[in-house]
UniProtKB/Swiss-Prot annotation:
InterPro entries: NAD/GMP_synthase, NAD_synthase, NH(3)-dep_NAD(+)_synth, Rossmann-like_a/b/a_fold. Homodimer. Its EC number is 6.3.1.5. SUPFAM superfamilies: Adenine nucleotide alpha hydrolases-like (SSF52402). Mg(2+) binds at D52, E165. One of its GO terms (biological process) is NAD biosynthetic process. Keywords: ATP-binding, Ligase, Magnesium, Metal-binding, NAD, Nucleotide-binding. Deamido-NAD(+) binds at R140, K173, D180, H260, K261. This is NH(3)-dependent NAD(+) synthetase. It comes from the Bacteria.
Length: 275
């Protein structure tokens, strides 16, 4: 088995999907988890205005709405959380995503004060954060807020991770990568677009340039610029297509060096890191 085949198998990626079937699969997956643990009453997700959180948010609201109707449990709710750092440049996209999702409840937690306070505390301890590390601080503060909300609402935190993100480890460890349940796992980027199109999402929300937008020195830095490959390259790789060796090498390089992000904390029984 080639490394490409191993990666495709590990991430559950497919070369072709039926969008309607995958929508139903994700919704039923979320419902089944909540039904298994009836003390859980909410799904919590941060909404950024980008493709991934818009899709995960819509699927989460669908799952909650269906389950509430099936069980007559009015306590069930989907909580969409806005988590700006100060003023968000694409705030209108966030509002458009909220309008499309129609969440039961919307909360806004501005993380700037908490991030600055943490940065100042570290500075006083002699640690000056780089812009890149400060970006990770933002991602972790966002996740911290979501877990606090989930803790107070008997909820679980929904993640936006998908195959095209997982393969490159393009997420913050214990930030946006630290979630409870990931309904998009297995899908690549273009397949996520297909699901949103099938759901009637406004095109500008899934055709916009993907960006983590974490760094102050490089605001709205496109994911593809940070990775050195395009999402079309990554999706083609995940669909089993043959890529130029130089492109495949970049993708596989990201996969190998970010393996630790896709695992639980390393123990004496792990040996993947010895490769």
């Amino acid at each position: 088995m080639t490394l490409q085949q191993e990666i495709i198998q590990a991430l559950g990626a497919k070369s072709y999907i039926n969008p309607e079937e995958e929508i139903r699969r994700s919704v039923d997956f979320l419902k089944a988890y909540l039904k298994t643990y009836p003390f859980l009453k909410s799904l919590v997700l941060g909404i950024s205005g980008g493709q991934d959180s818009t899709l995960a948010g819509k699927l989460s609201q669908m799952a909650i709405s269906e389950l509430r109707e099936e069980t007559d449990d009015d306590a069930l709710q989907f909580i969409a959380v806005r988590l700006p750092y100060g003023v968000q440049a694409d705030e209108q996209d966030c509002q458009d995503a909220i309008a499309f999702i129609k969440p039961d409840r919307v909360l806004t937690v501005n993380i700037k004060g908490a991030v600055l306070a943490s940065e100042q505390a570290l500075r006083e301890a002699g640690i000056e954060l780089s812009d890149f590390v400060r970006g990770n601080e933002k991602a972790r503060e966002r996740m911290k807020a979501q877990y606090s909300i989930a803790g107070m609402t008997h909820g679980v935190v929904v993640g936006t991770d998908h195959a095209a993100e997982a393969i490159t480890g393009f997420f913050t460890k214990y930030g946006d990568g630290g979630t409870d349940i990931n309904p998009l796992h297995r899908l690549n980027k273009r397949q996520g677009k297909q699901l949103l199109a099938a759901l009637g999402c406004p095109e500008h929300l899934y055709k916009k340039v993907p960006t983590a937008d974490l760094e102050d020195d490089r605001p709205s830095l496109p994911d593809e610029a940070a990775l050195g490959v395009t999402y079309d390259n990554i999706d083609d790789y995940l669909e089993g297509k043959t890529l130029a060796p130089a492109i495949a090498k970049i993708i596989e390089g990201w996969y190998v060096k970010t393996e630790h992000k896709r695992r639980l904390p390393i123990t004496v029984f792990d040996d993947f890191w010895k490769k």
